[in-house]
């Protein structure tokens, strides 16, 4: 596939949430360093993980069929030594973790002092089994649990908002239409792409109704 084809496919075929997630990861690419434990980190989206510039990139997954370096459950990481990891990468992971409190505690344990955890998590986004989907937490819940475990310098950023959530819902609806009607996405996606920009305006950010519709959160915290 050519670069132009990939760009077109990404523009018309990728959810607005995934595009946001790729951007957030790229904007914080400097956080990846040393030994990185990438839990559930199957390669998705257009973000290129900086595997070549870190000391070691360890791909861990609960399912062996994805060919991880280590098969493990984030809530039970006995195979990972205490304070041996510089960065724990948890992208779109914790909604699928049943024992989420234990998982966060384990991440804290394996991190070195000064180490970093990077989390992305959906909120107003469809239930999706991988293999199961257990929860959606608000920013207040995330702040409380991360503080209680011992994390510091917690930075929680909302991903998307009212118009991003609405646009993804419209896009998903289009995908369920008969083929001939699905062609309308070539007209609607450019319009929706403009619409999502409203989430970055004062119209939304300062509105006490419209600013309460995050699609998810991107979180960085330190041990």
Predicted regions, residues:
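Conserved N-terminal segment of class I S-adenosyl-L-methionine
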Residues: 1-83, 87, 212-217
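Redox-cofactor binding/interface segments in oxidoreductases and associated redox assembly factors
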Residues: 38, 90, 119
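Short conserved AdoMet
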Residues: 52, 98, 112
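Surface-exposed loop/turn positions
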Residues: 84, 114-115
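A short beta-strand submotif of the Rossmann-like class I SAM-dependent methyltransferase core
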Residues: 87-93
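S-adenosyl-L-methionine-dependent methyltransferase catalytic module, highlighting the catalytic core
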Residues: 98-102, 106, 116-222
